[in-house]
């Protein structure tokens, strides 16, 4: 029996989750230390597939190693199969009617509760899983697994309330016009990355919030933290079958996009994989019931440009954080550094290298370590391969350049100086703690902006450091399509939900702006309704009369 909604409810005001300091002696540090100790004492965890609310063990066992100690595993997980994907899609479609017809205030309450669970009851457990499994230090885990995840859920509810309130402004006499925002017909496939637990929650969460059903394939290197997010959503009240959790590899994705009921892809990951999936989806158009929607955030080759008028100290420190937080494994991380010669030679170079030399690299369990490991063997080999290539091309390694994979996948923060602005490390996405610097003549500022715009296929983030307003404006205009997020005198990373909607175009994705109302338009199908209160007495129009 349907439940009547007897009032128009207004959600509580939302704000960004406060981030805790984890200072020595603080209760949050003690809580996190306890969670880390407990988790390490229970390794490895077992992660099943979850289909229609039931645990499914396929006995095709894969492992999630800990990148700081790769001989040990955070969890083993049961890898899904194409047959299981078919079962999952059928189950999701069976759950669809009950979920999309659930009153909006009830769906909203579920996600508000999930936010409170993530930022409260399960805060330290989520952080511990993210630190051990994905190699984040305490602060990076805090801003991701605790704060941003909660922000995605809370602000998502606020944005959907705003979306539903968007109604036609005019009504003719005797009529009432209105718009409803239907969930998509079919299911959404969410394919989430390793580098942000919060994105793991947002990719299935955003479509589900507006009434869609979702098949979710987490990244193998983030399986355990994403499993915890799934459990939180279930505890908050997401019904069985609404989100189907299937760990595994590419075959999961391929099986899902073969279904005639596939309706949308919500993806974060590499540009090459996204392009390949787009082609595969396009080749299946004739089998789909509805044209699919493709939403993706992919790679970046992000940049800082330091104008001659820049405040040097701020530019130095922002460029340290932008490049080396989370080992450069953020889609938005600094990779290309363009510095005017007068700034480079009058303090920037010296200070930049001095600050980088202070960075401690090691396991996340040591509170002194600013950088941890890169995510795995493939990443380690790829990053060190880029460094080797840079040396072969004549690049000068100013600091770092070495790695140690004997126990964990550790790479030293690396700065390469190049005289070739289109060298390999200025063009290709490295996704690691490597910055390539190019020094330009002060008089070549506008030429350098053209280089920034034309050097890579990407268009995700960029930052401009200058005290002269005209320098900021010139760079903003000349880089109009080179970045979806631009920062003035601030590092190119760290977009906050509700403050800086995030996403880029070109080779960086569809720029649908996670963390804003924009993303939700992609997962609804609007329907206009016109109700007439006054009947016709004659079908003729006055113009027909003589």
UniProtKB/Swiss-Prot annotation:
Name of the protein in its database record: Delta-1-pyrroline-5-carboxylate dehydrogenase
Protein source organism: Agaricus bisporus
Cellular localisation: Cytoplasm
Similarity comment text for this entry: Belongs to the aldehyde dehydrogenase family.
Amino acids binding NAD(+): 279-284
InterPro entries in alphabetical order: Ald_DH/histidinol_DH (IPR016161), Ald_DH_C (IPR016163), Ald_DH_CS_CYS (IPR016160), Ald_DH_N (IPR016162), Aldehyde_DH_dom (IPR015590), P5CDH/ALDH4A1 (IPR005931), Proline_metab_enzyme (IPR050485)
A single Gene Ontology CC term: mitochondrial matrix
Pfam families, per database record: Aldedh
Reaction(s) catalysed by this chain's protein: L-glutamate 5-semialdehyde + NAD(+) + H2O = L-glutamate + NADH + 2 H(+)
GO MF: 1-pyrroline-5-carboxylate dehydrogenase activity
Catalytic residues of the enzyme: 297, 331
Main subcellular localisation: cytoplasm
């Amino acid at each position: 029996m349907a439940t009547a909604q007897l009032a128009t409810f207004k959600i509580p005001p939302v704000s960004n989750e406060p981030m805790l300091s984890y200072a020595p002696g603080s209760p949050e540090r003690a809580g996190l230390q306890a969670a880390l100790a407990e988790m390490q004492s229970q390794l490895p965890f077992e992660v099943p597939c979850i289909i229609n609310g039931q645990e499914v063990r396929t006995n095709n066992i894969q492992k999630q190693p800990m990148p700081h100690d790769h001989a040990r595993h955070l969890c083993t997980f049961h890898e899904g199969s194409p047959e299981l994907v078919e079962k999952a899609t059928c189950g999701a479609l069976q759950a669809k009617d009950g979920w999309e017809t659930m009153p909006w205030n009830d769906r909203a309450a579920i996600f508000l509760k999930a936010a409170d669970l993530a930022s409260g009851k399960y805060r330290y457990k989520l952080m511990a899983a993210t630190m051990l499994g994905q190699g984040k230090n305490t602060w990076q885990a805090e801003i991701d697994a605790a704060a941003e995840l909660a922000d995605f859920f809370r602000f998502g509810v606020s944005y959907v309330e705003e979306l539903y309130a968007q109604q036609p402004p005019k009504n003719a006499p005797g009529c009432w016009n209105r718009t409803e925002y239907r969930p998509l017909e079919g299911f959404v496939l969410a394919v989430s990355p390793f580098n942000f637990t919060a994105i793991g929650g947002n990719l299935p969460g955003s479509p589900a919030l507006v009434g869609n059903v979702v098949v979710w394939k987490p990244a193998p290197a983030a399986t355990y933290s994403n499993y915890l997010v799934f459990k939180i959503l279930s505890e908050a009240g997401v019904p069985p079958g609404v989100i189907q959790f299937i760990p595994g590899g590419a075959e999961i994705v391929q099986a899902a996009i073969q279904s005639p009921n596939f309706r949308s892809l919500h993806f974060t990951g590499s540009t090459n994989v996204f392009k390949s999936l787009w082609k595969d989806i396009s080749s299946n158009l004739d089998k789909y019931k509805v044209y699919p929607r493709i939403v993706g955030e992919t790679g970046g080759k992000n940049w800082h440009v330091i104008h001659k008028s820049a405040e040097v100290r701020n530019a130095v420190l922002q460029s340290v954080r932008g490049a080396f937080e989370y080992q450069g494994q953020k889609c938005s991380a600094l990779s290309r550094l363009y510095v005017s010669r007068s700034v480079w030679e009058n303090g920037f170079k010296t200070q930049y290298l001095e600050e980088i030399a202070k960075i401690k690299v090691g396991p996340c369990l040591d509170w002194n370590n600013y950088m941890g490991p890169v995510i795995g063997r493939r990443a380690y080999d790829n990053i060190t391969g880029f460094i080797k290539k840079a040396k072969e091309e004549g690049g000068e390694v100013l600091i770092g350049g070495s790695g140690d994979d004997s126990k964990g996948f550790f790479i030293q923060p690396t700065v390469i100086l190049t005289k070739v602005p289109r060298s390999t490390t200025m063009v290709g996405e490295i996704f690691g703690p490597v910055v390539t610097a190019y020094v330009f003549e002060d008089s070549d500022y506008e030429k350098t902006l053209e280089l920034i715009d034309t050097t890579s296929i990407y268009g995700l983030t960029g930052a401009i450091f200058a005290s002269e307003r005209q320098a900021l404006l010139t760079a903003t205009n000349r880089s109009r399509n080179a970045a979806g997020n631009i920062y003035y005198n601030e590092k190119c990373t760290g977009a906050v939900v509700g403050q800086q909607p995030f996403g880029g175009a070109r080779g960086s994705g569809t720029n649908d702006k996670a963390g804003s109302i924009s993303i939700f338009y992609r997962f609804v199908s609007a329907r206009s309704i016109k109700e007439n209160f006054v009947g016709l007495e004659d079908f003729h129009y006055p113009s027909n009369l003589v």
